[in-house]
Amino acid sequence: MSNAIVRGSFRQRVEEKIVQIGNLLWLFFIVLMLQPVISRRMLEYARAQALRNLERSRGSRAIALVHRQETMNLLGFPILRYINVEDSEEILRAIKLTDPQTPIDLIVHSPGGLVLAAMQIAHALANRKAPVTVFVPHFAMSGGTLIALSASHIVMDENAVLGPVDPQIGEYPAASILRVLERKSHDEIDDRTLILADVAEKAIRQLALGVTALLSKRLPGEKAQRLAELLATGHFTHDYPLTVEELRRLDIPVSTEMPEEVTLFMRLFPQPKQLTPSVSYLPTLPGRRA
């Protein structure tokens, strides 16, 4: 009788342990599933705090347009991001909700994107009564440059770059498509290329006029037109980096007094995690000892 009781008690304890282990496994999987969400929320909170710090230090409305390749934590797939209509809608709403007399600080870190979206943002910024400052901590290419040109002030890191704003038709630069017409007779060119050339001609003309209008708000008309033709008509390759020194040679006023708050904000957009990091360093800030 006593042996049966002992065996029953032992079996009960084993079953309780199995249930406890099962509960722990379920808890582990729940935490594993929630971890990316919690990490994302904490990162978003830190970014919001960094923007508030910039607003307090400069008495402005801070907006960020950052397109960093990010990785989904759960599956590890890279997400490539560009300027799109969703970005323009959000920024237009932010501008609309900002008092007309309040300065706007826009942080731009982008490889470019849709001309429509970038031009909408640029026009909205150019029409502001209060000063607009665009901060470029690393690069603002193509559509990002278009947005930067609309600002009252451009502030760049000493090593940051802008880029040309010449339109792209599919996978080809519009200016390069037009040069085919100059080097071949129409009899040697297929219909598709002729159609692309027609679209390319219109795209270059439209973008050059748009850039001229933006630059005319801060530069003399003749100089604005000259710069627009240089940047929008294929004088450079589309990925050509325009450094601070070169922009100043082109008479585009650029400052390099980058606020520390912007640098700290960009640290909250780390590179996608890899098995072996491609860049390693000990983070230090100007004025602080390592």
Feature map (PLM): residue ranges:
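N-terminal organellar transit peptides
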Residues: 2-133, 139, 155-157, 167-290
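Glycine-rich, charge-decorated loop segments at or immediately adjacent to ligand/cofactor-binding or catalytic sites
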Residues: 140-151
